[in-house]
């Protein structure tokens, strides 16, 4: 893969599989260690740039970097010169000049990660190519590491992804998670079904490698995995569905709907969950739910991504 991870669609099948395999290898390398430290990125500086609120993604990237012995520095809008009006470009160039090896960005603007990679790409000198850029979520565009950890969780639970039927349910329109999962899971050979009200499907979805349905119940009996999406009210201005109650009755994963799933099926959610709206608490806490497994896998996947963009070697340092 390239020295950046900007979109799930940029990953080949071999690239994605290598990251998933290395995520499993990192997890195994940490088993039994009293102190969870590997020397893999010793001497490297990783900077997280989060311009949107985050718990899971930010913490897992920080933990991933620290478990690999990198120096991890946090930059936020509130605590940096961004709060004084500094542009994203100037902040990026400052971090590049300061010697950052990797920039991990979450930003409300779609395409922000691509711009960051362009701005910091270096001056043509191969010894100074600029930092690697990892997209931790840009607007409604992409969230590639979330898709990777979802794929890893499905692979662990089901034994593989090829030929599996993955049903993605909810606010597809505003979901970068949905976009990245569609691209990655399709690349890995899964059959992807989108279930959403017509108002929460993006323009052009008919060109995606998916099947689209408005009938959640009809898709449950054949599902191998169900990925529930949060309704992103912060990106809406109203009018997408009549009421929370009606949305939940049509597109929420209730106990009744869980009973329609095959026994082997796995339930996923990228978080944060709106319990009682898109998913019942009893379902979220059930044995079919892999929500906490997703969080654990998030650390290992992000370790693998940092390894691939910064080192790119075949062997993980022990």
Swiss-Prot record:
Query: Which top EC class applies here?
Result: transferase
One Gene Ontology cellular component:
cytosol
Biological or metabolic pathway of the protein: Pyrimidine metabolism; UMP biosynthesis via de novo pathway; (S)-dihydroorotate from bicarbonate: step 2/3
What keywords are annotated for this sequence in UniProt?
Pyrimidine biosynthesis, Transferase
What GO terms describe the biological role, i.e. biological process, of this protein?
'de novo' pyrimidine nucleobase biosynthetic process; 'de novo' UMP biosynthetic process; amino acid metabolic process
UniProt xrefs under PROSITE patterns? CARBAMOYLTRANSFERASE
Q: What Enzyme Commission number does this protein have? A: 2.1.3.2
Q: What positions does the entry give for carbamoyl phosphate binding? A: 56-57, 106, 143, 146, 271-272
One matching Pfam family, short form? OTCace
Q: What catalytic activity does the UniProt entry give for this protein?
A: carbamoyl phosphate + L-aspartate = N-carbamoyl-L-aspartate + phosphate + H(+)
GO MF annotations in UniProt: amino acid binding; aspartate carbamoyltransferase activity
Disulfide bond residue pairs:
none
SUPFAM superfamilies the record matches: Aspartate/ornithine carbamoyltransferase
Transmembrane region(s): none
Matching InterPro entries, A to Z? Answer: Asp/Orn_carbamoyltranf_P-bd (IPR006132), Asp/Orn_carbamoylTrfase (IPR006130), Asp/Orn_carbamoylTrfase_sf (IPR036901), Asp_carbamoyltransf (IPR002082), Asp_carbamoyltransf_Asp/Orn-bd (IPR006131)
* Annotated binding of L-aspartate, by residue: 84, 176, 230
Q: Describe its function.
A: Catalyzes the condensation of carbamoyl phosphate and aspartate to form carbamoyl aspartate and inorganic phosphate, the committed step in the de novo pyrimidine nucleotide biosynthesis pathway.
Subunit description: Heterododecamer (2C3:3R2) of six catalytic PyrB chains organized as two trimers (C3), and six regulatory PyrI chains organized as three dimers (R2).
Q: In which family does this protein belong, per the annotation?
A: Belongs to the aspartate/ornithine carbamoyltransferase superfamily. ATCase family.
Q: What name does UniProt use for this protein?
A: Aspartate carbamoyltransferase catalytic subunit
Organism expressing this protein natively: Mycolicibacterium paratuberculosis (strain ATCC BAA-968 / K-10) (Mycobacterium paratuberculosis)
Gene symbol of the encoding locus:
pyrB
